[in-house]
Amino acid sequence: MVIIGPRGPGSQRLLLSLLLLAAWEVGSGQLHYSVYEEAKHGTFVGRIAQDLGLELAELVPRLFRVASKRHGDLLEVNLQNGILFVNSRIDREKLCGRSAECSIHLEVIVDRPLQVFHVDVEVKDINDNPPVFREREQKVPVSESAPLDSHFPLEGASDADIGVNSLLTYALSLNEHFELKIKTKKDKSILPELVLRKLLDREQTPKLNLLLMVIDGGKPELTGSVQIQITVLDVNDNGPAFDKPSYKVVLSENVQNDTRVIQLNASDPDEGLNGEISYGIKMILPVSEKCMFSINPDTGEIRIYGELDFEENNAYEIQVNAIDKGIPSMAGHSMVLVEVLDVNDNVPEVMVTSLSLPVQEDAQVGTVIALISVSDRDSGANGQVICSLTPHVPFKLVSTYKNYYSLVLDSALDRESVSAYELVVTARDGGSPSLWATARVSVEVADVNDNAPAFAQPEYTVFVKENNPPGCHIFTVSAWDADAQKNALVSYSLVERRVGEHALSSYVSVHAESGKVYALQPLDHEELELLQFQVSARDAGVPPLGSNVTLQVFVLDENDNAPALLATPAGSAGGAVSELVPRSVGAGHVVAKVRAVDADSGYNAWLSYELQPAAVGAHIPFHVGLYTGEISTTRILDEADAPRHRLLVLVKDHGEPALTSTATVLVSLVENGQAPKTSSRASVGAVDPEAALVDINVYLIIAICAVSSLLVLTLLLYTALRCSAPPTVSRCAPGKPTLVCSSAVGSWSYSQQRRQRVCSGESPPKTDLMAFSPSLQLSREDCLNPPSEPRQPNPDWRYSASLRAGMHSSVHLEEAGILRAGPGGPDQQWPTVSSATPEPEAGEVSPPVGAGVNSNSWTFKYGPGNPKQSGPGELPDKFIIPGSPAIISIRQEPANSQIDKSDFITFGKKEETKKKKKKKKGNKTQEKKEKGNSTTDNSDQ
């Protein structure tokens, strides 16, 4: 507290002192205030918020608080005005005893950010304690033979105050025999003594009663008094005398009880009772309840009873006297100073305050976690404390002020590795042996969203049968997040995109919590073979993190499409077909051909033909090819055969269960000379067969040249486009693929516009031209860089027994068939190898497996039992079209061979049929001529 008085030299000195004090405070980084003890509640101490540079408005939000280690309730801060005031009674004597300096150390703590300020409040003494004597009356025996100027020490008064307030002034009541003299000791303390100025006469004055008054130096002055009773003794003119006027003893504070302190010795030259000495303790300063001293009255030995504590009192002053037994007795006085040496008997104390828990996982290095204070009541090296922390932790201790430390973050935290730390703070003093204490600090790491959900693998393949019920569960995705609580709460969603003309969400959906993927509508293999999409997993953190997984859903084919009959030149699709057959044709003559197509794939699209039992009679001279659908004569027709035959042909696929369709063929037998215009096989140029044959050959040559030229031009254009186009990677080309196969007898081509092809990329559709040669496995690189030498066939490949029946008939590809490539592309192998055959002389091949999935092998192999091995550049007789078990014959025939080259099935759109009508007309005319000559064409070769 600053007190302003009248101006003058004293006030100038006071002002200078205050300026020096303020400069010292700025240099030390602390605030210093002062307050008088016994101040009333609410007494102003200082504007602590203003002095610390804090705004009043931020005291409450920043949790402004004052902490004191032992005296937290004496002072308080008003958070409204930032004033430090007295909260409860301050007693300096109780707080600091007789210490010259007395202050209250405060810690001012504010958060956001965490700051600590140190404030010292000096407690100033006031004169609130009067000087007192230990006893109300002091008895002083004085021999009447005492010489003048004899000194008689008196017991002085004590004042609990300090400084000026404890400066004592003694005064003695008026008398004619004694005067008062003040004796100053080495420690600057004073001791009152009576000095004899006039000889005593016991007979005249046996007793004297004096009043000793004491006045302190405070304002206002406080006084005390004691009665001095002087007894005049008879002549015993020699009093006891100690060897030394004072003694000094040094003891360790850990001495045992009943330890001897010192052996005193006093002597009296008198004889008899006047020479017998009795020892006693007159006074012990300071007074202690723990430690007591006693003296043997006969021997003068002083012993200690109790415990010495350096931290309580580091020195004791024992005033002893020696009294003889003379009458009157005389006394000698001495003083024993006992100094206490400190030993390391106090364990350091550790106090953890202001914990900022939990600690965020992304907290910056240097963030203050807690404040730690240590103390040791010992002195010197025994009281010097060093703190240490548990090793190998991302924290460290930083000394801030004297015995104060800050626990700060030393390196980055990772909750996923360690979610909590048990720290041990060890405080060790410098004693020998050193003492130590520990304090445990539990630091919990709070999670932040720093880990994205992760899937077990980046891509999943799912197989789903078509015609599934709406809402069926097809797959479950699961992602794991290493974070905790809401940061690990994963939700799933579709990565929306377009699938053709529809949104992805119209096909599938994903449950946000479970990750279950559902098909919202029945899938159709014929429309959608592969559905590729992404599922996103996101956590609930802020900001949310996520990752994607790719799902490839392959739609497996089911036998849900019955064979469909194709239109013929003589009738519409599904209607009856009329054919005229001359009676002169021989056995094996092709009468008609039933053409059908199945929208399914694999076994489900593998068609077989048979005559219905109702249409089979004992004398019916016709049969149908099992896989070709060609109706041919079984023998030479004669007059006994009925002129009209109604044939019912059953077309059946190989699905489970099999689906069928029925075609009706009306066959009329006519004489050789008849050529009705209604016959589907009639030719306009039948009047001159030789001229018609020449015209047909010319047309055939022109058609073959045109097709070959178109093929070469297409290949050149395709190669030029591929070489000039920039290299791009496309997962899927949903365009219109074109397949061209070459053989010695010509070329056949296939072009099919897919209904819908789904892929994950956004690349534009491409039109691919795929050229295949038997016994060669093609890839994209093979098309651009053809090998110099053809590959040798694998001799381990065999035909299956189920297809041996088809080995004797060639499948002629026309516009009725569908040729598919599986979802894996032409590089995938068709698993058709079967080495377990009972007939080693014949090769085997198995039909497609898996309903069209992974059935894209274009490699043709012959077993070792087959005597024909294709050499380089040679072509095999038959090969398998992927997606269909049909066996394609490309055997080269002689130039004069009369093969019906029109019976060649291609799988594609119906528009392909129109392109080949002209070519068929020439073949039909030639066939009509051959029938007239009774020659046999076997198209099964």
UniProtKB/Swiss-Prot annotation:
Its job: Potential calcium-dependent cell-adhesion protein. May be involved in the establishment and maintenance of specific neuronal connections in the brain.
Source species of the chain: Pan troglodytes (Chimpanzee)
Protein name: Protocadherin alpha-12
Name of encoding gene: PCDHA12
Biased composition (Basic and acidic residues): 900-914
Chain intervals for the UniProt region annotation (Disordered): 818-941
GO process annotations (BP): cell adhesion; homophilic cell adhesion via plasma membrane adhesion molecules; nervous system development
Domain called Cadherin: residue spans: 30-133, 134-242, 243-350, 351-455, 456-565, 581-678
Cellular compartments annotated: Cell membrane
CDD domains: Cadherin_repeat (cd11304)
